[in-house]
């Protein structure tokens, strides 16, 4: 599925408050599973269920066996004390791992310290420090013996976490369906080590790391995600698409033709993309770059004073420039050029499309902010374990947001979102 290419030249005329075409919203939004009588832990197990924990135990045991059968294990190594784990112990281990994100200490061994100043006896009551560290060392999510070779024509760079990502991707889509207003943006998981698909995004808090495209509802619920692993070899005609258009088409696929309103930033926004979405009964609004092909020159080159707006229309498309502290270029199929009061008392009126854009974007950054205080990933972890920890926490946040859908704005354990 892809936007149409080689569109004919658009005819732009000054906008005159035409009411844009609206598609009825037909998405079956809300919780898609029965939650009557659920305790808080039951919302968690909607995403991280017993089957997944059983799988973790199986693959952890498999990797430990593969590691210990190697020739480079010293007789005196602590790993020789390993014995197979089981789902019950794996659940205990994951519970302690999550707890390390709530009770922050600079080193793992301090959780087992008996010093009265910072002891946490719960950890030692559940398992020994050595056992926890062994489980963390051997924690695995796929069978290394099945990993594609270096010369494979299309290697899966996320092989080590693929089953976990596939499981959570499926559950995110099954448990809850977003309401009408959604957004797509990228999240950046901090990683400064060596990695072939590490990205640099200067405006993100982490700046260096693993980039993940996320489709979120305005509540913050993550419905779908896609991890960027480098340029893809996509067969024609999809290979002719820009990366950003391909990302949006992929993430939006299950929500097309249902009247959704999508908000995106200038990395994604293009005229072909918004026309493609419109052809699939999906409206969109986004900031756009000044060099975007087809954007009308009278709007692009307009010299405006603060608070002034210039808008042109071509059928369903509205192109706009608004002068605030700086020029803001917008492209939308949702709005006309209506102006509404700004949020501050002394603020100028602003185009409604900018007010709505500011309201419905930024959810991915908000998700990152909500998870950051409870980060359970240590700097010493390998990249795939850090990525796994991140998505386990994302699943936990999604479970909390579903809990809130059932219980209103009530906080849980002092945590609110």
Residue ranges: model-predicted function:
Residues 4-43, 283, 294-392, 398:
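An anionic, glycine-rich sequence signature occurring as long contiguous blocks
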Residues 117-126, 298, 302-303, 417:
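Eukaryote-specific, cytoplasm-facing alpha-helical/coiled-coil scaffolding segments in long proteins
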Residues 406-417:
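A short, flexible helix-boundary coil/loop motif
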């Amino acid at each position: 599925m892809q936007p149409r290419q080689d569109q004919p030249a658009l005819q732009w005329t000054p906008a005159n408050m035409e009411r844009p075409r609206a598609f009825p919203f037909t998405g079956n939004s809300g919780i898609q599973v029965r939650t009557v009588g659920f305790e808080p832990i039951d919302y968690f197990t909607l995403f991280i269920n017993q089957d997944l924990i059983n799988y973790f135990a199986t693959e952890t045991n498999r990797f430990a066996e593969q590691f210990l059968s190697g020739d480079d294990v010293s007789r005196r190594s602590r790993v020789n004390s390993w014995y197979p784990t089981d789902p019950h112990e794996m659940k205990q281990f994951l519970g302690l791992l999550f707890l390390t994100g709530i009770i922050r200490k600079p080193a793992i061994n301090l959780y087992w310290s008996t010093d009265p100043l910072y002891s946490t006896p719960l950890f030692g009551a559940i398992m020994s420090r050595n056992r926890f560290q062994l489980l963390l060392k051997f924690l695995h999510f796929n069978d290394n013996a099945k990993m594609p070779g270096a010369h494979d024509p299309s290697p899966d760079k996320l092989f080590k976490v693929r089953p976990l990502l596939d499981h959570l991707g499926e559950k995110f889509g099954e448990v809850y369906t977003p309401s009408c207003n959604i957004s797509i943006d990228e999240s950046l998981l901090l990683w400064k080590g060596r990695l072939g698909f590490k990205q640099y995004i200067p405006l993100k808090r982490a700046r260096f790391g693993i980039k993940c495209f996320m489709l979120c509802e305005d509540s913050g619920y993550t419905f779908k995600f896609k991890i960027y692993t480098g340029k893809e070899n996509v067969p024609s005609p999809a290979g002719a698409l820009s990366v950003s258009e391909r990302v949006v088409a992929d993430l939006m696929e299950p929500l097309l033709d249902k009247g959704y309103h999508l908000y995106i930033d200038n990395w994604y926004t293009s005229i072909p993309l918004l026309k493609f979405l419109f052809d699939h009964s999906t409206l969109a609004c986004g900031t756009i770059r000044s060099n975007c092909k087809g954007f009308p020159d009278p709007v692009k080159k307009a010299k405006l004073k603060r608070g002034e707006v210039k808008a042109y229309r071509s059928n369903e498309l509205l192109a706009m420039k608004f002068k605030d502290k700086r020029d803001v270029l917008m492209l939308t199929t949702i709005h006309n050029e209506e102006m509404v009061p700004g949020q501050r008392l002394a603020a100028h009126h602003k185009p409604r499309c900018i007010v709505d854009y500011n309201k419905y974007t930024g959810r991915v950054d908000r998700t990152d902010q909500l998870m950051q205080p409870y980060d359970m990933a240590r700097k010493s972890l390998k990249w795939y374990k850090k990525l796994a920890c991140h998505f386990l926490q994302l699943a936990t946040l999604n479970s909390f947001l579903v809990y809130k859908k059932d219980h209103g704005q009530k906080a849980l354990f002092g945590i609110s979102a």
